[in-house]
Amino acid sequence: MSFLISFDKSKKHPAHLQLANNLKIALALEYASKNLKPEVDNDNAAMELRNTKEPFLLFDANAILRYVMDDFEGQTSDKYQFALASLQNLLYHKELPQQHVEVLTNKAIENYLVELKEPLTTTDLILFANVYALNSSLVHSKFPELPSKVHNAVALAKKHVPRDSSSFKNIGAVKIQADLTVKPKDSEILPKPNERNILITSALPYVNNVPHLGNIIGSVLSADIFARYCKGRNYNALFICGTDEYGTATETKALEEGVTPRQLCDKYHKIHSDVYKWFQIGFDYFGRTTTDKQTEIAQHIFTKLNSNGYLEEQSMKQLYCPVHNSYLADRYVEGECPKCHYDDARGDQCDKCGALLDPFELINPRCKLDDASPEPKYSDHIFLSLDKLESQISEWVEKASEEGNWSKNSKTITQSWLKDGLKPRCITRDLVWGTPVPLEKYKDKVLYVWFDATIGYVSITSNYTKEWKQWWNNPEHVSLYQFMGKDNVPFHTVVFPGSQLGTEENWTMLHHLNTTEYLQYENGKFSKSRGVGVFGNNAQDSGISPSVWRYYLASVRPESSDSHFSWDDFVARNNSELLANLGNFVNRLIKFVNAKYNGVVPKFDPKKVSNYDGLVKDINEILSNYVKEMELGHERRGLEIAMSLSARGNQFLQENKLDNTLFSQSPEKSDAVVAVGLNIIYAVSSIITPYMPEIGEKINKMLNAPALKIDDRFHLAILEGHNINKAEYLFQRIDEKKIDEWRAKYGGQQV
């Protein structure tokens, strides 16, 4: 006799019923008796067994299997009745009642399918097929190794079941390797034994201006990226900052605005805080220097220096404005630079050549407030005897700069100070708004910002926690990382460390110094005083998300030389890098997994993807290089490497040709590609989060996963059975027409 057998291809049957039917057909082919070897008819869409020479037709899968195996025993047994009455009825449900399925399939295995060993009867195989179609994961867990013929039949049956998302049940399950995630944040962050404790500071922004983009990337954003990296690595890190509020500039600005210095500081502290919140700067504490703790700690350090012989009195010539009857802070004197002859140099520094100046060095000095010619006057002041501390400072700098891998410009600037020889520097001023000098003779003077401001790091920490000394008097267990623009370097490598050394107390001192050069605006310069460039409030008004601003600023971070903000480059990077690379990779795969797998990660064998070992090698190299660069504070390079992982993910999808054809015709490979691909997205999210925390959160939300810790090795942390959420767009295309509009609108006017 000549028989043809065909698989169930009915589109009306639920996928689980179709799988059960086709598994029985496949089992029939594997277990066919010697007298009956049917041939497969792939052109027939109906499930049947028919004789091509005689009028004979069977169209029930159970009957076909019994006939082909020539085994009609057991049809009245409890086992067979359970297979039909209890299990087969479930197969006709479009939506399986999962709780009911779990109970009945477990009962089937415990009572009727205790072992799956040859010889197997037709009744055994019918029961197996029904259980497998309803709960394949249970079968695989109970029987890790299926009998050879059964294994072959399962593989064949799957090929004849059109895959659709209805066979994957998304119940929001989270199946993540827990030891690979980021630890939750402590309510109060304090150093811990046997952990890497890192104290991170950003240069304290001066309070009386809106920060521009150069200020933001030069200190707070750079520090934030590193702090988020540390926390992503599960280091024990504390990130503090605050506004620097004392000094002549505040007094004078308050006079201009007709308010008290305190009112001015309150106003601008909120402006700074709001700008940084919008930029998603994740301070653990953002404070200010106008506090009782600042007075207490600064006066303590002053007193210790005095008692140890590192302070001295000198009479100092200062510039005095005869029009508004006040001593002028260095930055409120302007004139011609004696070095480069720039006409608008300030009394403390030339914006053009960067030289540090004394106001008396300026050619034709003038009062910034009223253009009057200032007069020299003498006043007694306290000086920090840096000359007496020079050998200690030099020895410390040599050791700390090497151990802490200071950036090149940090070393160069510090060495230029040391090379010229340190001289006593004035640390008091004739002002009202400041930390009072704790000496009777000088009770009407205050501590100068050069000395006072850096102590703000300590006082701000003390306002965060009463246990602040665990951070600041704990050099054996705490590493201090500081971020700033290059103009702040001497205060952090000479003045502040000198003050710490002079107290002869056990201070936590600078370990790693990370400095930036200047970020220029288009073809000009940012300037706080002149309002040239894009400021924080302008960025908020642009309608572009803070993630894009953070990304762009990090990508042009002036690490070794000055760099430029360009509107053309800003738009191009959004469209070609964020949208076309990162956004495309994440969106394409997550949409595919939702469309084809109903958001469920299938059982997978990673070896089924093309050159899996080569892929892992590539990813491990990317991750290890990322960690290496970030540990050194090379954030610009770290971002390039992070984006290269996204590009490698796109390449991975192309290499494996992930599409509908792969899903339907090569299910095992498709399953592996989506599972491995989702884990690449998870890794991308971990290393992109320091730069764009909101994007990292969005990706993790789509993945329905907690934050993955940053590692230098690739892990398959998302496991089989994990359920993801729907895709959402991460980025939007920016119309190139906006370039000229923004260039005109944000051409340097500060609100």
Swiss-Prot record:
Question: Keyword Glycosyltransferase, does the record have it?
Answer: no
Where is motif 'HIGH' region found? 205-215
Organism superkingdom: Eukaryota
| Catalytic activity from the UniProt record | tRNA(Met) + L-methionine + ATP = L-methionyl-tRNA(Met) + AMP + diphosphate
* UniProt-recorded Gene Ontology molecular function terms: ATP binding; methionine-tRNA ligase activity; sequence-specific mRNA binding
InterPro entries given in the database record: aa-tRNA-synth_I_CS, Anticodon_Met, Met-tRNA-synth_N, Met-tRNA_ligase_1, Met-tRNA_synth, Methionyl/Leucyl_tRNA_Synth, MetRS_core, MetRS_Zn
Q: Which GO terms describe its cellular component?
A: aminoacyl-tRNA synthetase multienzyme complex; cytoplasm; cytoplasmic stress granule; cytosol; methionyl glutamyl tRNA synthetase complex
**Effect caused by changing G502D:** In mes1; renders the protein unstable in vitro, elevates the KM for methionine in vivo
Sequence segments annotated as region (Interaction with ARC1): 36-92
What UniProt keywords apply to this chain's record, in alphabetical order? Acetylation, Aminoacyl-tRNA synthetase, ATP-binding, Cytoplasm, Ligase, Nucleotide-binding, Protein biosynthesis
Write down the top EC class of this protein: ligase
Motif 'KMSKS' region: where? 525-529
Q: Which of this chain's residues are annotated to bind ATP? A: K411
Gene Ontology terms describing biological process: glutamyl-tRNA aminoacylation; methionyl-tRNA aminoacylation
Subunit field text:
Component of a yeast aminoacyl-tRNA synthase (aaRS) complex formed by methionyl-tRNA synthase MES1, glutamyl-tRNA synthase GUS1 and the tRNA aminoacylation cofactor ARC1 in a stoichiometric complex. Interacts (via N-ter) with ARC1 (via N-ter). Can also form a stable binary complex with ARC1 that is functional in terms of aminoacylation. ARC1 increases the affinity for cognate tRNAs due to the presence of a tRNA binding domain in the middle and C-terminal part of ARC1.
Which HAMAP family has this protein been placed in?
Met_tRNA_synth_type1 (MF_00098)
Q: To which protein family does this belong?
A: Belongs to the class-I aminoacyl-tRNA synthetase family.
Q: What is the protein's known function?
A: Catalyzes the attachment of methionine to tRNA(Met) in a two-step reaction: methionine is first activated by ATP to form Met-AMP and then transferred to the acceptor end of tRNA(Met).
Miscellaneous comment: Present with 85000 molecules/cell in log phase SD medium.
This protein is called Methionine--tRNA ligase, cytoplasmic
Organism equals: Saccharomyces cerevisiae (strain ATCC 204508 / S288c) (Baker's yeast)
